[in-house]
């Protein structure tokens, strides 16, 4: 309900309470244009109402007849009401002290990092740093992450994060398959690897023909494997000397992957020093809450020879136009949006925000602080080992860092019972053994309580911690010869910012370098950079969500699972499908899971041979990359001159592959920003030839409430909660990529049997390390839907379409809109064709993107899906004022181009070719350009009161790839 201004109500009869309640207030804050602005934009487009515009844009044949069936969430909640409802769910969770371990540990997030990174929109609303000149802050933070990982693992180079430890291990397996022993298809996994890691590896290996063998680590050299995975320390706590084994594996022609605990590596000899080829792991215990499984930043580090085969993103150092150091994403030609099915991985979203948190944890503590934490954890474990031995229990492992396995025999059930009474979780290793893993939050009081549990089970008295500390000096823990002697984190960044004042200023200096949604609109097509409301973000830091172990007993996670069930039903309503799994922790993983589900469906019908996946030429690069990972053969379907799927070519390809057609992958609205009129026909053709229809949900922001893939012929889709449903992009992650399916596919949704999560017996294997993936950020989407309600979610979609058409209409006289539907209308994004400009002026799409930085904008998506174009997506959250500011910038840039075309500006010495302009360049004593300093820095008047300065000039991408350097830059280079 839209309230009148209070001044107009002063002299009237008092309104009822119902009329004054503001349940819709959040929607008015989320949707940028108010009613007057919307009408003004509609007038520009020639429509009387938003409904009339939508009728003209979306084919009537696929329009949703009913309002979103959100059940109890159909009516919007106020921000306070939604927070209270979610708090009630959170309070149903029980926060126990968890010593379960198995790759997840409680941790202290330094308050300065919590407030100034995790809770700071300058960090969490940024996009992936594809435009390096306006991303130097987060690129530096990610470079710190890479340096931290490389130092601690002892390997040459690390990437800028992966999704979780299990998927990182699977990526390492496929990396070694591409580069290793050609005669073998065997990957050997030691039997003390984390069980969730083994399950994800099995899932990944099956469709691409890799045979996974498991057994004792000692037998690995005889396995004739192209790669071997070792855990260091092992899941049960053992710290083993793998030097001789690694040599033997290499001698047999294999390579070694080590899943290593980074905190342990501050005191243990790193894998790179004893011959490992690849190291993977999780950085969660570096200040990132457990969060019921995620999100956390995994890492993958390699020897130098594998650097060009690494999956994921990689930050490298180059120089800018002035020869100064500049950071950028390196080796981007490896990535799926360029190489498609030949990419090194399908990973797109990773875990940038969490990687930044982990790197800042290392910056804040420094090498001495990290080692002190590690030694304290190890000492607590040693005291516990001494204490339980005094109580008559035997430890299974004599060597350990933080984890002990205790032989509890017939008293095992009692130990768990007594622990539960003290609100303590222990790992259930077996019917006769208990696992205990310590972390930085463990205190001497915690240790005393834990010893009391075992004393109660033993019928004895617990030894005091002080007595143990005085008498346990000689307790063995780390194996002789494996103590770390090499230095790490020697770069100045890890040795300077240890006071909170210094840390606060360092974080501020980095965030000031970047352009995120807190400064301006980010009109990236296919990315949906909408509002990430503060009220949606608040629950992420609640301990009732953050301090829950992913493998905690079910009775402790009632609130979490209830919230997850509700969110799944919300997404079922939005998509028109029958069931949803939230396990995939990125869109790429949801896509991959969906294809595995399709394969499982065909196999259940005796048609496992169906392996051809039709993909339109316009598709996002993750589509063919995911199809390849799922063991499918990619067949490209042509698009017509209007950017639509060529129906004749589709029919021909479907007929040609009728016997082995598995699926088609389409994006809707299309990647060209248009609602294709014949989408139902596309689905029918594929179904008629035995295939399933995969509808990529990347553009779901144009469909919610208006149409639904599950209703116009889709069988499976993935969604991007970090696009449509308001999880922030975090500078390149986290994300959530739920997979939604029709009723006939529901029984194939992913399980995680290794941790006791079995959704359906026929379900595919795990695709993420935790049963619910990145569970701790799911409250963001829950809050968004709860506060919007059915009517306002639909209004948001309509406004996104309105905003896109307004931009297209206003810019069409200056830049051709490449594709449009009937009436010249677009969906929620539009493609501006800059190719004619290149012909007439020599100005490239890259030049325009860089020049937009001088105007205070992040560029739209460049050269996707068509080279030489810009794809613009404004979302519903941007006001008309911000849209007009962007339009004015684009028109002004067009006039600058016209000056080149008409000879009034030089083809090389003009403000576009030299963009972006830094403050240092503009204020330098010498100004060598024909255009003025004012035109360079202040091309429009509005910049006089609100100016963003790019911190570096144009980055030299070619130089950076030729001279690959992916470690922290010495201070002297900035002189």
Curated annotation (Swiss-Prot):
Disulfide bonds: none annotated. GO terms for biological process: glycine decarboxylation via glycine cleavage system. InterPro entries: GcvP, GDC-P_C, GDC-P_N, GDC_P, PyrdxlP-dep_Trfase, PyrdxlP-dep_Trfase_major, PyrdxlP-dep_Trfase_small. GO terms for molecular function: glycine binding; glycine dehydrogenase (decarboxylating) activity; pyridoxal phosphate binding. The glycine cleavage system catalyzes the degradation of glycine. The P protein binds the alpha-amino group of glycine through its pyridoxal phosphate cofactor; CO(2) is released and the remaining methylamine moiety is then transferred to the lipoamide cofactor of the H protein. Belongs to the GcvP family. The glycine cleavage system is composed of four proteins: P, T, L and H. This is Glycine dehydrogenase (decarboxylating).
């Amino acid at each position: 309900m839209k309230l009148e201004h209070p001044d107009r109500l002063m002299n009237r009869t008092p309104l009822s309470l119902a009329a004054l309640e503001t349940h819709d207030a959040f929607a008015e804050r989320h949707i940028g244009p108010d009613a007057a602005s919307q009408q003004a934009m509609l007038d520009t487009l020639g429509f009387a109402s938003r409904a009339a515009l939508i009728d003209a844009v979306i084919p009537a044949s696929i329009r949703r007849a009913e309002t979103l069936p959100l059940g109890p969430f159909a009516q919007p909640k106020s921000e306070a009401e939604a927070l209270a409802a979610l708090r009630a769910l959170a309070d149903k969770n029980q926060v126990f002290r968890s010593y379960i371990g198995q790759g997840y540990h409680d941790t202290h997030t330094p308050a300065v990092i919590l407030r100034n990174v995790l809770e700071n929109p300058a960090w969490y609303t940024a996009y992936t740093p594809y435009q390096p000149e306006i991303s130097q802050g987060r690129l530096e933070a990610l470079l710190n992450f890479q340096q931290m990982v490389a130092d601690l693992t002892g390997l040459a180079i690390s990437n800028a994060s992966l999704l979780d430890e299990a998927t990182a291990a699977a990526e390492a397996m496929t990396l070694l398959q591409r580069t290793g022993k050609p005669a073998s298809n065997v990957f050997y996994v030691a039997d003390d690897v984390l069980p969730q890691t083994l399950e994800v590896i099995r899932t990944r290996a099956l469709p691409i023909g890799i045979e996974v063998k498991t057994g004792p680590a000692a037998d690995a050299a005889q396995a004739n494997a192209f790669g071997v995975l070792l855990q260091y320390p092992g899941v049960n706590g053992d710290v083993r000397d793998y030097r001789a084994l690694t040599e033997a594996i290499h001698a047999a022609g294999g390579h070694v992957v080590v899943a290593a605990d980074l905190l342990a590596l501050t005191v243990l000899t790193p894998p790179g020093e004893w011959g490992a080829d690849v190291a993977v792991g999780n950085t969660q215990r570096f200040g990132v809450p457990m969060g019921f499984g995620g999100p956390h930043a995994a890492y993958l580090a390699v020897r130098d020879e594998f650097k060009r085969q690494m999956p994921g993103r990689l930050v490298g150092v180059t120089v800018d136009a002035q020869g100064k150091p500049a950071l950028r994403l390196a080796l981007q030609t490896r990535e799926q949006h360029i190489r498609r099915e030949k990419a090194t991985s399908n990973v797109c979203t990773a875990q940038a925000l969490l990687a930044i948190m982990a790197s800042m944890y290392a910056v804040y503590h420094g090498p001495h602080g990290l080692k002190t934490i590690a030694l304290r954890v190890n000492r607590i474990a040693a005291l516990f080992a001494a204490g339980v031995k005094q109580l008559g229990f035997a430890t299974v492992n004599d060597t350990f860092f933080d984890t002990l396995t205790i032989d509890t025999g017939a008293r095992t059930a009692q130990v768990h019972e007594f622990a539960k009474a003290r609100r303590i979780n222990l790992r259930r290793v077996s019917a006769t053994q208990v696992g205990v893993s310590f972390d930085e939050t463990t205190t001497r009081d915690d240790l005393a309580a834990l010893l009391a549990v075992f004393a109660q089970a033993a019928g004895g008295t617990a030894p005091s911690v002080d007595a143990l500390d005085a008498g346990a000096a000689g307790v063995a823990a780390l194996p002789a010869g494996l103590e770390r002697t090499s230095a790490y984190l020697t770069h100045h960044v890890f040795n300077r910012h240890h006071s909170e004042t210094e840390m606060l200023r360092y974080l501020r200096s980095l965030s000031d370098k970047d352009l995120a949604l807190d400064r301006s609109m980010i009109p990236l097509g296919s990315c949906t950079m909408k509002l990430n409301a503060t009220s949606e973000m608040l629950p992420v830091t609640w301990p009732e969500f953050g301090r829950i172990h992913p493998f905690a007993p079910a009775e402790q996670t009632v609130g979490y699972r209830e919230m997850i069930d509700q969110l799944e039903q919300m997404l079922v309503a939005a998509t028109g499908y029958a069931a949803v799994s939230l396990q995939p922790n990125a869109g790429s993983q949801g896509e991959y899971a969906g294809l595995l589900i399709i394969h499982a469906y065909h196999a259940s019908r005796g048609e496992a041979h169906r392996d051809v996946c039709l993909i339109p030429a316009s598709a996002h690069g993750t589509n063919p990359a995911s199809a390849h990972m799922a063991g499918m053969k990619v067949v490209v379907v042509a698009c017509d001159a209007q950017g639509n799927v060529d129906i004749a070519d589709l029919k021909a390809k479907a007929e040609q592959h009728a016997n082995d057609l598995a699926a088609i992958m389409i994006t809707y609205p299309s990647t060209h920003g248009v609602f294709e009129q014949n989408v139902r026909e596309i689905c029918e053709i594929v179904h008629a030839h035995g295939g399933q229809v995969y509808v990529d949900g990347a553009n779901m922001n144009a469909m919610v409430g208006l149409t639904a893939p599950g209703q116009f012929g889709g069988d499976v889709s993935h969604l991007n909660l970090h696009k449509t449903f308001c999880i922030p992009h975090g500078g390149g992650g986290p994300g959530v990529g739920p997979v939604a399916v029709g009723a006939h596919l529901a029984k194939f949704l992913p399980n995680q049997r290794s941790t006791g999560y079995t959704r359906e017996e026929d379900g595919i294997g795990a695709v993420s390390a935790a049963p619910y993936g990145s569970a701790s950020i799911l409250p963001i989407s829950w809050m968004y839907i709860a506060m919007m309600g059915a009517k306002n979610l639909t209004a948001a979609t309509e406004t996104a379409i309105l905003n896109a058409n307004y931009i297209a209409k206003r810019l069409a006289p200056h830049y051709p809109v490449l594709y449009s539907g009937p009436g010249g209308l677009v969906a929620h994004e539009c493609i501006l064709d800059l190719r004619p400009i290149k012909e007439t002026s020599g100005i490239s799409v890259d030049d325009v993107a860089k020049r937009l930085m001088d105007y205070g904008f992040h560029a739209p998506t460049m050269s996707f899906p068509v080279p030489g174009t810009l794809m613009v997506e404004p979302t519903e959250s941007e006001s008309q004022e911000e849209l007009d500011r962007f339009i004015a910038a684009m028109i002004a840039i067009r006039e600058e181009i016209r000056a080149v075309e008409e000879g009034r500006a030089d083809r090389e010495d003009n403000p576009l070719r030299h963009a972006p302009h830094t403050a240092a360049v503009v204020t330098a004593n010498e100004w060598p350009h024909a255009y003025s300093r004012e035109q360079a820095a202040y091309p429009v008047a509005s910049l006089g009161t609100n100016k963003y300065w790019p911190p570096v000039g144009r980055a030299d991408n070619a130089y950076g790839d030729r001279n690959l350097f992916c470690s922290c830059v010495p201070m002297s280079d900035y002189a």
